[in-house]
Every structure is written in structure tokens, then in C-alpha cells.
């Protein structure tokens, strides 16, 4: 499905300013939408909206359907009468420029628990009706999620496969008993989702009303310690005890001699095919209730994926296996119709991957930071772009453009300079705007840049470094960094290259 000629900014809500240690769905999110509109932008791209997992990654969430309760605007809960002004006083340890998850998570969760209790005791009839309607509408995933989260709390530090066997195997009598024993915590997790969904939908409606579409992100793989894997063990490559036989990753390449062992469970694609890809169809349908456009991560895994024995410590000793291919996308399209999906086709892209993307008619991705290694045949260079493409200066996995430039080889720097007809030393101060202009000028239908590049920030402001487990996903900006000239220059480029 072709996308209109537009442009936008990549920024996860956790990176927004705010007093409570991490960005959330409060006033700063609405201010950011207003800024996007004033800068002439039409897209706000985010990372996955689920809760953070190991290493605080949003790509390892405990559910493919649930939202991140850490994003809940606590001030809005106070306006409902569920928190006090004293509850909203920030911890002095909170930082404006980085998220200290070790401090933020317990602080926010304690206040969410207080709000849940107050709501249970003092909710109005209208609030109770809205809560019950939400629970009924989302029961297909919400009940498993809430029970899973309650059981995970009751068995701290243990994989679900190490829970009592009756719970790990999901024996009905054991589940009923657990639901009774953990009723209060189950209600808490339901409440958190209700708060997240109503706040998120309000923000999304605000953005849509101002001409801003939300670009979401759907990881191909699911976290092993997730409600999805526990609830649908038949759909994943697990042994009879619920343990992973094989895990996901990518093989060794130029950047990594041992590859990347992600550790996600792999899909049992034969089981998905047997029921017409119902789980995937429902996942995609649900995702589109939250966002307007979806980027599917690691698209190449649908053509073929790298299978690694779970016993292997690295990704070296794996093998390629065929993915579901076109059949999955045909099943989704048959059920849901044509959808605005972006295929993240970065990495090892073989002819079968490109053929699948073209058969699905999904736009792929081009990243300009990858364009200047090699010669004129590098497909990331703008003269090779196609209209059905999304071009980025960099993604959340890249360095900032200023950081990339400072670390680039002399050959890369010279290539950029020759390509632009300039001297390399002339680009030191404005390389970020140079790449933004290059992206906006591209024939690609969609152009996106991280906010860090608009602000000209260096490598210290990078969002993620793949393969490094700690210290990432923590970057935040402050409005003092955003000058009027930033929005004005972005708006001028957007108008110049007909992306408004």
C-alpha cells in the first residue's frame, strides 16, 4: 500500500520531558504534537508501546497487546481523585536528560497501585461502566495478560516454565485457583491497561485532529517471558515443558563475528498456518486500533529466519529456515483489507526478501547513514530510492547523525562530500541538516528523522546500540533544547520538497 508524500519525526514517548522521571502521555506529549504541526510534519513515529523488558527494551515486552503502564500520566489520575498532590511530588533522584529505570519503575508503580485502590473504592458509576466495558472488549488478551503478570509477581525471578507445573501447563483448575488467589493484583493489571488505553486513545485522537498520524512498531518476535508465549505455547517452538528448543537471532556479519543471539522463541509456523494465521491477524488488527501506520520489524524473518539451538551461547551455529512468506500477508489482507504497513527490510537482504516485499506491495526502508560505504551502486544512496520507500537519516538503532559523522571513516566522509559537491570539513557543523535535506528531497514517499538529528545532538544522545544490553532506551530531551529555528527550518524543507 502506497503512502502519501509526507515527513515526520521519530521519538518514543519515554523520551518526552516531564517531572516524573520518564516521558509519559501527559502535557508534554500534547505539546510535542503541537510542535509537529507547527513544523509542518504529518508523522510521529514511535517504538513499540508495550512494557519494557530485559535491558529496558520496548522490543521485549511482556505482551504483544498490552500497553506500557509506565507511560500513564499520573497527573490525570490525580484529576480523577485517585492520587493526591503529595503523590505527584517527584523523586529528587530523577533526571531530566536520562531515565533511571531503577528509580522510576518502583516510584511509578507504587503510585499506580494507590490509584487502582482509590478507583476500586471511589469510582463513579460512569467510570466503573467504562472500566467494565474496556475489560469486556479486550478480554481475549487482557485476562491472560493480567493473570500472567500477577503470577510473575508471585514467582519473582523465575521463568514461567519454572512455575508449578500445573500453572506452566495452564491446567484449567490451577488457573481458576490462581485467579482467585491473585484477584487483587489481576484487578491492578487490568486497571493499568484501562488507564493506558484511554490516555493513549485521547492523545492519538488529538494528534489525528491536527493532521498527525502515528507510526507504530510491531516487533516480529515475542519475548520468551510474555503472556503471549505462556498463553499460546502451541504457536511457538517449545518443548513439552515449555522451554525453548531454538531461539531467534541473526548470523555473523561484517559488524559482529558471532552474530546476534536475541533469545526470542521462534514461531511454529505450521501451527499458525493451520488456523489461517489467526493470532497474527488479531495482533495486526489490535495494533491498528492504537496507531495509523505500522512498521513491522525484521521483515526478512518472514521470508527466512535464523534458527539457533537454545543451548548455543552465540548465533554462530544456526541455520536459515523458510518463513511463512506471502501466505501470512495474504491471510491478513483477506481479513483486514489493505493496510499501511512499512517493511523494515534492513540487514541481510537476499533476493527472496526483496521479492516478498514487492509481492506484498509494502514500502521498504532506506537509511542514509548506510549510504556512503561502498560505491555508486549502494542502494541506500538517494539516486537508487524508489517512491514506495521510507527514508531515514537514521533509526533508533543508529547513532545520531552528528555521532555517526564524527565516527565515520575518512572514506565515508569524502564520499558524502563528493556526493554533495562540498568539502568534508564544511559539513562538520551541519551534517545533520544535510542528511535531513537529503532525505526530504528523496523521491521516497516518506521521510523520517529522529528528533536528535533535528536538534543536532551528538552520540551521547543515542537511543540504542544493538548488541549492548545495558544503558540504552533512556534518552530524554528538554524543551530548552528546541529553538524556534528548528521547527522553522524543518517546515521550510517540508514545503520545499512537497511533503506538507
Q: How does the language model describe each region?
A:
Residues 1-40:
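Mature N-terminal, pre-catalytic/accessory segment of carbohydrate-active enzymes
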Residues 1-5, 10-12, 55-197, 222-448, ...:
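Alpha-amylase-like alpha-glycosidases and glucanotransferases acting on alpha-linked glucans and related
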Residues 27-52, 289-291, 439-441:
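Catalytic domains of carbohydrate-active enzymes, especially glycoside hydrolases
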Residues 37, 200-208, 333, 357:
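Surface-exposed amphipathic alpha-helices with a cationic face
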Residues 47, 213-215, 219, 293, ...:
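Outer-envelope exported proteins of Gram-negative bacteria
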Residues 189-221:
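Conserved, well-ordered alpha-helix/loop/beta-strand core segments that scaffold catalytic motifs
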Residues 479-500:
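Terminal-tail/helix-coil boundary detector
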Amino acid at each position: 500500500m502506497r503512502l502519501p508524500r509526507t515527513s515526520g519525526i521519530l521519538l518514543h514517548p519515554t523520551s518526552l520531558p516531564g517531572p516524573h522521571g520518564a516521558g509519559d502521555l501527559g502535557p508534554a506529549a500534547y505539546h510535542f504534537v503541537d510542535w509537529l504541526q507547527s513544523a509542518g510534519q504529518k508523522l510521529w513515529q514511535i517504538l513499540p508501546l508495550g512494557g519494557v523488558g530485559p535491558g529496558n527494551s520496548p522490543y521485549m515486552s511482556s505482551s504483544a497487546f498490552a500497553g506500557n503502564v509506565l507511560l500513564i500520566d499520573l497527573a490525570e489520575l490525580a484529576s480523577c481523585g485517585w492520587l493526591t498532590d503529595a503523590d505527584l511530588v517527584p523523586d529528587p533522584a530523577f533526571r531530566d536528560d536520562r531515565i533511571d529505570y531503577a528509580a522510576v519503575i518502583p516510584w511509578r508503580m507504587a503510585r499506580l497501585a494507590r490509584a487502582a485502590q482509590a478507583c476500586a473504592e471511589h469510582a463513579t458509576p460512569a467510570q466503573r461502566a467504562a472500566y467494565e466495558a474496556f475489560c469486556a472488549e479486550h478480554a481475549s488478551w487482557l485476562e491472560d495478560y493480567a493473570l500472567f503478570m500477577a503470577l510473575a509477581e508471585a514467582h519473582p525471578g523465575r521463568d514461567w516454565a519454572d512455575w508449578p507445573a500445573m500453572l506452566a501447563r495452564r491446567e484449567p483448575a490451577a488457573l481458576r485457583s490462581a485467579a482467585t488467589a491473585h484477584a487483587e493484583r489481576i484487578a491492578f493489571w487490568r486497571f493499568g491497561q484501562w488507564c493506558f488505553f484511554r490516555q493513549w486513545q485521547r492523545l492519538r485522537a488529538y494528534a489525528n485532529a491536527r493532521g498527525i498520524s502515528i507510526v507504530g512498531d510491531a516487533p516480529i518476535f515475542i519475548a520468551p517471558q510474555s503472556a503471549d508465549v505462556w498463553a499460546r505455547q502451541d504457536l511457538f517452538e517449545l518443548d513439552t515443558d515449555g522451554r525453548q528448543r531454538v531461539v531467534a537471532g541473526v548470523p555473523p556479519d561484517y559488524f559482529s563475528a558471532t552474530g546476534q543471539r536475541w533469545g526470542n522463541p521462534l514461531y511454529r509456523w505450521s501451527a499458525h498456518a493451520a488456523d489461517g494465521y489467526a493470532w497474527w491477524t488479531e495482533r495486526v488488527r489490535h495494533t491498528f486500533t492504537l496507531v495509523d501506520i505500522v512498521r513491522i520489524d525484521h521483515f526478512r524473518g518472514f521470508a527466512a529466519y535464523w534458527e539457533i539451538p537454545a543451548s548455543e551461547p552465540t548465533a554462530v551455529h544456526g541455520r536459515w529456515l523458510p518463513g511463512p512468506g506471502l501466505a501470512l500477508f495474504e491471510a491478513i489482507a483477506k481479513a483486514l483489507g489493505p493496510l499501511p504497513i512499512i517493511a523494515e527490510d534492513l540487514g541481510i537482504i537476499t533476493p527472496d526478501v526483496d521479492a516478498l516485499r514487492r509481492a506484498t506491495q509494502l514500502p521498504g526502508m532506506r537509511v542514509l547513514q548506510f549510504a556512503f560505504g561502498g560505491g555508486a551502486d549502494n542502494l541506500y544512496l538517494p539516486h537508487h530510492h524508489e517512491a514506495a520507500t521510507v527514508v531515514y537519516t537514521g533509526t533508533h538503532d543508529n547513532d545520531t547523525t552528528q555521532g555517526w559523522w564524527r565516527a565515520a571513516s575518512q572514506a565515508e566522509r569524502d564520499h558524502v562530500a563528493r556526493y554533495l559537491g562540498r568539502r568534508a570539513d564544511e559539513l562538520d557543523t551541519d551534517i545533520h541538516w544535510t542528511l535531513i535535506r537529503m532525505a526530504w528531497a528523496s523521491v521516497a514517499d516518506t521521510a523520517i528523522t529522529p528528533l536528535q538529528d533535528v536538534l543536532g545532538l551528538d552520540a551521547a544522545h543515542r537511543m540504542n546500540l544493538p548488541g549492548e544490553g545495558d544503558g540504552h532506551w533512556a534518552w530524554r530531551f528538554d524543551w530548552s533544547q528546541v529553538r524556534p529555528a528548528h521547527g522553522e527550518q524543518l517546515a521550510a524543507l517540508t514545503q520545499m520538497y512537497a511533503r506538507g
